[in-house]
From Swiss-Prot:
It is an enzyme of class 3 (hydrolase). PANTHER family: PROTEIN PHOSPHATASE METHYLESTERASE 1 (PTHR14189:SF0), PROTEIN PHOSPHATASE METHYLESTERASE-1 RELATED (PTHR14189). The gene is PPE1. Its EC number is 3.1.1.89. The active site is at 207, 234, 371. Keywords: Hydrolase, Serine esterase. It catalyses: [phosphatase 2A protein]-C-terminal L-leucine methyl ester + H2O = [phosphatase 2A protein]-C-terminal L-leucine + methanol + H(+). This is Protein phosphatase methylesterase 1. It comes from Cryptococcus neoformans var. neoformans serotype D (strain B-3501A) (Filobasidiella neoformans). Residues 1-27 are annotated as: Disordered. The keyword Calcium does not apply.
C-alpha cells in the first residue's frame, strides 16, 4: 500500500475530541439513567437523562426510543442458528400500494404500470460492523414518509451486535462471511417462510453488511423470493481491502469507555462519527453496554454508569478480508437492479469502473455525509431508494395493434413476471 494512499485514508479520519463531555465534573454526583421496562412489542425506551449539558450547549443528547421510528419489534430465533435476533420493522401499507399501481399516459399515449406484489415490498437492511439495526431508524421513517407507506422496512441486529443474543458466547465473534450469510438467510426465511406468499425484498447492506446481502440475493431468488434490487452503501472492494492494515489504528483511536450513555452520544456527534444528532440519539445506546461493576459480573448491574462497546471489533479481525474479497464481482453478477451509494468521491476499483461504463449498476454519490451516510442524511438516501425502487419495478404498457383484440379477449391477461423473479 502506497504512502500516498495511507495518508489519504488517515486524513479522512475525524479529529477525535476527549471522551469526557464538557459538562462532566468529578465533584458532581452522576444520576443513573434507568431504562424503562420493555413493552410487549420488544422495543426498549430510555428515560430522558437528568444530567443535562452545560449552559453553553443547548443540544439535547438524551436517548430516543426506537418506537418513534419503527412500528414494531420482534425476537426471532431461527432453529439453524444459536442466536435470538432483535428485528425492527414497519410493514408496508398494502391498500395504498394497490391504488398507486398505474400512471397516466404520457405524450406518446403510452403509460407505465408499477409492478405490484399483493404482499407489498420490504427494504431489508443489514448494518455494518460495530453498528446496530437502529442505525436505520431515521431512514425507515423517511422511507415511509417519502414512499407514502408503500414500502416497508425491516432491520435487525446481527450476531454479536445490539440486542441480539447468542446462546454460546464463544460464537458471538464468529462474523465470517458464511456465518453472516447463513444468519441473514435464516432471518428472511423465518420472517417470510413461504416464498410464494412473501413480499418483494430489496436488500440493502452497509459496509460489512454488504457482503451477506449481495451473496444472499441469488440464493433467495433460487428459493423463489422476488428480489427487485440490491443496494450497497459506502463500500468498494478495492479501497476496503487496501484500508484493512489501517483498521486497528482507526479502532485504537476510539475511547475504550464512556462515563454515561449521553457521554457516548455526545462523543459520536462531536467526533463527526455520526453527523445527525437525532440518529445518534437512537442508534448509539444500542452499540454500547453497561460496563461490569467491580462487585458484579453482570453488565446490567450498572445501567446508568460507565459504558463500553457492545462489539469487540478487534476480535473479528480474522474475518475482515473475507467480507470484502470478491464483493465487486458478486455485486455485478446479481440478476436484479443494482445501486451503489457512496459518501463523497470514493474511487471505484477496476471491476466497478468497468461495470459502471457498461451501465451495469446505478451509482449515487452523496455529499456532506460520512461513512454512516444512512444516518447522516436519511431523507436524501430515502428519496434515492424510492426512485430506484419505482424505476426498476415499472413496465411499459404497449397499446394493442389496430384491429387486434386486447390481451383479455383471448386467454385472459398477459402474465408478466415480477422484476427480480427467476
Amino acid at each position: 500500500m502506497s504512502d500516498m494512499f495511507r495518508k489519504s485514508v488517515l486524513n479522512k479520519l475525524p479529529h477525535l475530541p476527549p471522551t469526557r463531555a464538557p459538562w462532566a465534573d468529578e465533584s458532581e454526583p452522576i444520576e443513573e439513567i434507568d431504562e424503562e421496562d420493555e413493552q410487549l412489542d420488544g422495543i426498549g425506551e430510555f428515560k430522558p437523562a437528568t444530567m443535562g449539558p452545560s449552559k453553553h450547549d443547548t443540544q439535547d443528547y438524551s436517548p430516543l426510543s426506537a418506537s418513534t421510528f419503527f412500528a414494531q419489534a420482534a425476537e426471532v430465533q431461527p432453529p439453524s442458528t444459536p442466536c435470538t435476533f432483535r428485528v425492527y420493522l414497519t410493514p408496508p401499507n398494502l391498500s395504498i400500494a394497490s391504488t398507486n399501481a398505474g400512471t397516466p399516459p404520457g405524450p406518446s399515449g403510452l403509460r407505465t404500470q408499477q409492478q405490484t406484489n399483493r404482499h407489498g415490498t420490504y427494504l431489508v437492511c443489514h448494518h455494518g460492523g460495530g453498528a446496530s439495526g437502529l442505525g436505520f431508524a431515521p431512514l425507515a421513517r423517511e422511507v415511509k414518509a417519502k414512499g407514502n407507506g408503500e414500502m416497508g422496512v425491516l432491520a435487525f441486529d446481527c450476531r454479536g451486535h445490539g440486542k441480539t443474543s447468542t446462546s454460546d458466547p464463544n460464537l458471538e465473534l464468529d462474523l465470517s462471511h458464511d456465518t453472516l450469510l447463513s444468519d441473514f438467510m435464516a432471518i428472511i426465511e423465518m420472517m417470510f417462510p413461504d416464498p410464494k406468499e412473501s413480499p418483494s425484498l430489496i436488500l440493502l447492506g452497509h459496509s460489512m453488511g454488504a457482503a451477506p446481502v449481495v451473496s444472499a440475493a441469488p440464493e433467495l431468488q433460487k428459493k423463489g423470493y422476488t428480489i427487485p434490487g440490491v443496494v450497497v452503501l459506502d463500500v468498494v472492494e478495492g479501497t476496503a481491502v487496501e484500508s484493512l492494515p489501517l483498521m486497528k489504528s482507526v479502532l485504537s483511536k476510539r475511547p475504550e469507555s464512556f462515563r454515561s450513555v449521553i457521554d457516548a452520544i455526545y462523543w459520536h456527534v462531536t467526533s463527526n462519527s455520526i453527523r445527525n444528532v437525532e440518529s445518534a440519539r437512537v442508534s448509539v445506546p444500542h452499540i454500547i453496554v453497561p460496563a461490569p461493576s467491580s462487585s458484579s459480573s453482570d453488565p446490567s448491574a450498572n445501567p446508568g454508569g460507565k459504558q463500553v462497546w457492545r462489539t469487540n471489533l478487534v476480535g473479528t479481525e480474522p474475518y475482515w478480508e473475507g467480507w470484502y474479497k470478491g464483493l465487486s464481482q458478486r455485486f455485478l453478477r446479481t440478476k436484479c437492479a443494482r445501486l451503489l451509494v457512496l459518501a463523497g468521491q470514493e474511487r471505484l476499483d477496476r471491476e466497478l469502473m468497468v461495470g459502471q461504463m457498461q451501465g451495469k449498476f446505478q451509482l449515487e454519490v452523496m455529499s456532506d455525509v460520512g461513512h454512516y451516510l444512512h444516518e447522516d442524511n436519511p431523507a436524501g438516501l430515502a428519496a434515492t431508494l424510492i426512485t430506484f425502487w419505482h424505476r426498476n419495478t415499472r413496465v411499459l404498457v404497449l397499446p394493442p395493434k389496430i384491429g387486434a383484440p386486447g390481451p383479455g379477449a383471448r386467454g385472459g391477461p398477459v402474465e408478466v413476471k415480477q422484476v427480480g423473479q427467476q
